[in-house]
């Protein structure tokens, strides 16, 4: 769920793309963010985050990751942006 910014609302697709590309599901407009930076993927009741080849990396709870499970309350850092993952917030 996005709670602040231009993309506010629940994200209901199985793959959510975050990046500087204007057509990203979560548009993060800053030079520290790659055009195609990261994806949040839902598989059943589980969620994962994966970096998709970004220059500056994707961080989960302050650790750089390539692919990792997401849990409620986890903090993602993409470039200068910090995002907190909340599951099931319609």
Where are these regions (language model features)?
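Short linear Ser/Thr-Pro motifs
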Residues: 24, 32-34, 54
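Intrinsically disordered, low-complexity regions of eukaryotic proteins
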Residues: 9, 27, 41, 53, ...
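Hydrophobic aliphatic residue packing
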Residues: 26, 33, 49, 65, ...
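C-terminal boundary/linker segments immediately following FHA domains
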Residues: 59-90
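Intrinsically disordered, low-complexity acidic Ser/Thr-rich regulatory segments
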Residues: 1-29, 41, 82
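Short hydrophobic/aromatic patches on the structural cores and recognition surfaces of FHA
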Residues: 18, 36-60, 73, 83
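A short, sequence-level motif marking secondary-structure junctions
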Residues: 13-17, 30-34, 70, 89-90
